[in-house]
Amino acid sequence: MENLPFPLKLLSASSLNTPSSTPWVLDIFLTLVFALGLFFLLLPYFSYLRCDNPPSPSPRKRKRHLVSQRHLVSQCPTGRRGRPRGRMKNHSLRACRECPRGLEETWDLLSQLQSLLGPHLEKGDFGQLSGPDPPGEVGKRTPDGASRSSHEPMEDAAPIVSPLASPDPRTKHPQDLASTPPPGPMTTSVSSLSASQPPEPSLLLERPSPEPPALFPHPPHTPDPLACSPPPPKGFTPPPLRDSTLLTPSHCDSVALPLDTVPQSLSPREDLAASVPAISGLGGSNSQVSALSWSQETTKTWCIFNSSVQQDHLSRQRDTTMSPLLFQAQPLSHLGPESQPFISSTPQFRPTPMAQAEAQAHLQSSFPVLSPAFLSPMKNTGVACPASQNKVQALSLPETQHPERPLLRKQLEGGLALPSRVQKSQDVFSVSTPNLPQERLTSILPENFPVSPELWRQLEQYMGQRGRIQESLDLMQLQDELPGTSQAKGKPRPWQSSTSTGESSKEAQTVKFQLERDPCPHLGQILGETPQNLSRGMESFPGKVLGATSEESERNLRKPLRSDSGSDLLRRTERNHIENILKAHMGRKLGQTNEGLIPVSVRRSWLAVNQAFPVSNTHVKTSNLAAPKSRKACVNTAQVLSFLELCTQQVLEAHIVRFWAKHRWGLPLRVLKPIQCFQLEKVSSLSLIQLAGPSSDTCESGAGSKVEVATLLGEPPMASLRKQVLTKPSVHMPERLQASSPACKQFQRAPRGIPSSNDHGSLKAPTAGQEGRWPSKPLTYSLKGSTQQSRSLGAQSSRAGETREAVPQPTVPLGTCMRANLQATSEDVRGFKAPGASKSSLLPRMSVSQDPRKLCLMEEAVSEFEPGMATKSETQPQVSAAVVLLPDGQASVVPHASENLASQVPQGHLQSTPTGNMQASQELCDLMSARRSNMGHKEPRNPNCQGSCKSQSPMFPPTHKRENSRKPNLEKHEEMFQGLRTPQLTPGRKTEDTRQNEGVQLLPSKKQPPSISHFGENIKQFFETIFSKKERKPAPVTAESQKTVKNRSCVYGSSAEAERLMTAVGQIPEENMSLCHARHASKVNQQRQQFQAPVCGFPCNHRHPFYSDHSRMLSYAASSQQATLKNQSRPNRDRQIRDQQPLKSVRCNNEQWGLRHPQLLLPKKAVSPVSPPQHRPKTPSASSHHHH
């Protein structure tokens, strides 16, 4: 106290000894507080003024302006310079709005200041706040009343106080701002505290002193803690020592000293280092001596406050920014609860330079509204106070007094490698001061101190709950979770401790001491167990009920609520809340599920659970429940949602099972629906396909037709059905495929031979009506089984029967439709058989009979041909199945076709039936009856059927064969249909009617839907159109016939047609064929002569179709040529002649063949008159067959 002026000492002694000074000090303190509030209120305004119009500092103060300007400019937004002053009002308002927050922060600081000053005043160590004496000199306590001249030099203290002293603006000794403080210990003498600057509107912030030197090692000397401190005022009785830091009004006596300006004589000397105003702005520079003492105390208070605030602030900021090194210098936690001079515990906060710098930065960030006057003292006191603390620390070295400190330091050093959460808990205990009673947390400020309740709560929150309780309890929770840390078990949880702060503080102290006594094992446990424990904590989080199935989580979900564990209570509460929500949700979804509604959210959620849950089951063990063994674990809701009712779980599981079944099989089922539809449609076609065999060849005739027929003999029924689908909707038999043996190929070959120019697509597109009929025309599909179809002949025959069953309507009456197509078919058959059609028996393409009478005839024919077909099927392995499309759209399989009768049936048997108009339906009936009676002699019928089918098939294949053959066939079919419709009509009438029917019915056939009911009508119209077209276009037929054999007579051609019919229908016994040849030999010769002599002439002796195969083919070719020419020249005449001749031929055949062979007779008769048109379509086919 030698350096203190006398008035200050006197004032200090009087203030310390006079208890009555308490009210006065309190008033002064309150005045200071309000002055600070006003200053903060006006400071933003001044700062904005300074930003808008910054004054040019004098050279003397330029450096000081530098720092302050930096601070102020940082507050000023960019671009504020030169802004209109009219907008300053807004800034002022904003500053005013910020003032309350600044005031609150000020109150906070002041309250902390009082809380820190309390222990000093209680212990009577008022003078201990002063800094230590120069090194090597032990300060002595001056007696009460001691005085010194105020002008006494302060040489001994000046060089030491340089870091703290700040030059008075009015002093004549400019300070070197760049000077650095000396490395020795530093003292905060009164002179350093007296250098306070007067408040200025634009308070300049001195640049903070450089980084403090290494003053923190323990000083070698132990100065008297009372040295260099002003004596307590007279009459002042220090309060008894207390273990509490509670501040009472008496504690504020020494703080609320009047603050006046400091005399200039007390300013530091020139050699003082760079410093900062201690409490600039708090008072004027001209003040009484008493103000100096107050300033001294205030500065000392700031020093202590800085240390304490740093501790508290570091405790709050340790999570993110504070370095563990800072806590190495905070061994306060080792102090016991015994009473000690506060100065002996406070200096123990010995931050390193780095830690001190961090603390300063944190203080700046934590108190942004503080004026530079407050920031600089806190910075400087943070540097200077440790100097005085070091003196006191020297009195009691920590190594001697507290041998356990090195262990704690080591433990804290090891905290660098600890997880963040563990570091936080460690930091809490390292920063906490258990020597302070628990009341400090609840009552930081005196009860009568004017602090708002909100600020009070904030102080308690930051200094108490967050700084000490919560973190300590976090560590306790971690230790409780750790298997080996049973010490922390049984201790209150954070929430319970927050309610009872005292107990939690004591427990925190206990835990801290335990860590201090044995830090290494716990540290090892923390290091080894924390990550696992943290992962367990994450798994046990209630929000992961669905995903976490570990033993820990299950135990946490099922363990009873601990009465002494707040965390368990919260966890249980959260779990109950989640369970309630899930129960409500599941109840709602259960109702929806029962109603048949499956919410999308439930689906997705369970899908996600199914994906995540089995994965956890692979590596997680469940203690209470067996782990699911398959991906069906998601269904096992008992594991995941054990809190649900059993009924709800069962329903949910059943729902999940159904959902997964739908999810897995829904798409296949949706795909199977159309497949089933196809299967239903293929019922009839399936048998045909089977009959057709696995041959991969497709009937080119069918392909040539507008209807795309894919023979899927080797493919599955579904694929075959798909391929069988007709491209044109007009075609009504996408499913009906006519299994054709090589005969089909032969038919195709024949049209191939026919020039494509003559063929307008499959069937020459006749008129518009005819074009529409073309698609409907090729109603019969021939599946080229080639000779391979021969395999499974019996099966094919049976399949043919099945096909018949599938097709409700019987096979097309071969005697009728086949007659129309017979000539072409027989010609084609001849053409095919000439090169060896026996093996490649032409599968008779069953032509669709338009007339129900034709259907009946076809039924009869089929029934008649079946025996012969079966016989020949046995003889020949080739399978030729003829699918007859009935008017109803149903297809009938002609077993004779499957048997490839054509191969076995001699061509002589294949008699061309008059495809022209069968005038007399009676004749047809007779033929059918004859067929019925002569089942064994139905070879001619079969050939007729084959011929008809083949004629249709050649016509049906849209290839050249069809077009060429169709031209004559059209005429023939027209005549035939007319004959069927009006069998009694004369040839002329029939021809006209046929044309009319063609013009009228063929057009409706286009319009008619593909329904089976109108299918026959469409077929009729189609054939009529074809016939008419063929009549109109017989040239291609003629060309083909010329290509084949022009020397053959029409009779031979008719016999060839008969052969084709025989081949298509089935194998006809050779005896019948020989008989037919014998009977019709003369007639065939006559017909040949007739055909050869007049090209247009038509042999009436079609009754002799059973001529030698070769002769038949030749005659057929000649007849077809002649018929073609004749049809071209005079189609009407030819038709009439055909109509007449078929009648005659039918009659003759009936007479000759009797009832046994009505078909043969009919083909013969029909062939003779109708052979030209029939030969026309069939001539091309036959010729083409011959060529091929």
Curated annotation (Swiss-Prot):
- TM region(s), chain numbering: 23-43
Q: Which portions of the chain have biased composition (kind: Pro residues)?
A: 210-241
Q: Where is the composition biased (Low complexity)?
A: 191-207
Q: What is its main location?
A: membrane
Q: Which Pfam families match?
A: DUF4599, FAM75
Superkingdom, according to UniProt?
Answer: Eukaryota
Q: How does it sit in the membrane?
A: Single-pass membrane protein
Recorded GO CC terms = membrane
The protein's UniProt keywords, in alphabetical order, are:
Differentiation, Membrane, Spermatogenesis, Transmembrane, Transmembrane helix
Task: Output compositional bias ranges, type Basic and acidic residues.
Answer: 138-154, 960-976
Q: Which GO terms describe its biological process?
A: cell differentiation; spermatogenesis
- Output the InterPro entries linked to this UniProt entry: SPATA31, SPATA31F3-like
Bias category Basic residues: which stretches? Answer: 59-68, 80-92
User: Where in the cell is the protein located?
Assistant: Membrane
- Biased composition of type Polar residues is found at 495-510, 783-800, 943-954, 1121-1130
Entry similarity comment: Belongs to the SPATA31 family.
Q: Which PANTHER family match?
A: ACROSOME-SPECIFIC PROTEIN, SPERMATOGENESIS-ASSOCIATED PROTEIN 31C1-RELATED
- What is the official name of this protein in its record? Spermatogenesis-associated protein 31C1
Gene name, Swiss-Prot/TrEMBL: SPATA31C1
